[in-house]
Amino acid sequence: MQATLIVVTYNGRALLAQCLPAVVEAARRAGGHPVVVADDGSDDGSAELVRASFPDVRWLGLPHRGFGETANAAVAAAETEAAVLLNSDVLVAPDFLPPLLELLLAQDVFAVGPKFLNPAGSLTDALGNRTSCRWHRGLLEIHHETRPERLRDPCAQLYANGGAMAFRREKWLVLGGFDPLYRPFYWEDVDLGYRAWGRGWQVLYQPASQVRHDQGSTMRRTQRLSYVELMSAKNALLFAWKNLLDPALLRRTLAAQARWAADDVLIGTPPPRTRALLAALRQLPEAARGRAREQLERVRSDHEILAACGASP
């Protein structure tokens, strides 16, 4: 199976200089897979670096539209059966690719995620491993497995982390890729995995493939922490409104949101979660359209999706 390795970047010249040698070498060792840098409107000399230092890497320069839409354009432009999406702050192991592609050979598999390690090579604070979700005070929260004994074998997971994921292009295109509802960033990969499960496909975790990820380093360089947290909270709400088709689960979520909105009114000054709610409400019509599409196309219930990937309903 041939795969296009796509590195998405935005003003990440220094990160590209660190990550691309490993990506190019991994692609070569796995049999010669194409490598593409999909650029989200950088103006820091990234193009000059890639063209001068990595002549075999294709440069795909795009207008600044955010991570999700840049990834979508790059996947659409690829011509291989599979694709591998990588953040520029990810360092891949030399042999990371074959184990991912091996699991993709099954026709019902949409995506496969590797084992994520921190920059020091340990599991401490590493996110993206054997993902699932849990309910906390009525709200859906993403869970990342951290116990080594539960990260030894391939298994199902809720979604493949967008920082490093392999997938079948045809299924990606059927799903429509990352939904721009979640602009500018965060939760688009959760949404994609949930929708794939809803179509009857699988998302798997493959610990035999390893990458090191400096979680959030790109965001720290380009965005304020308060803004990142606001967008993450907003998109968590939009995910629930769009994807939870089970009436009881949606009622549970809406009731929890109403409770903390009322608490915030009593406090008097809008805390981040109230600002997130107001921001999400501005996108409610867009989320409703996505929900209508899901109602037409889904073949698994919410409970079946959550059970299949080991999540708690």
Regions found by a protein language model. Give the residues of each.
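A short, conserved alpha-helix in the catalytic core of glycosyltransferases
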Residues: L158-G176, L181-Q210
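Short, acidic, metal-binding catalytic loop of nucleotide-sugar glycosyltransferases
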Residues: A22-G32
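Conserved donor NDP-sugar-binding/catalytic core segment of glycosyltransferases
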Residues: L91-T131
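Short, flexible, basic/aromatic active-site loop/helix in glycosyltransferases
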Residues: C133-Q157
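Glycine-rich, basic loop-to-helix element that forms the pyrophosphate-binding segment
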Residues: G61-A78, S88
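Non-catalytic, C-terminal membrane-associated alpha-helical segments of glycosyltransferases
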Residues: P247-P313
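A conserved acidic beta->alpha catalytic loop
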Residues: A22, D39-E48
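Short aromatic/hydrophobic "clamp" motif used to bind/position activated sugar donors
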Residues: A83
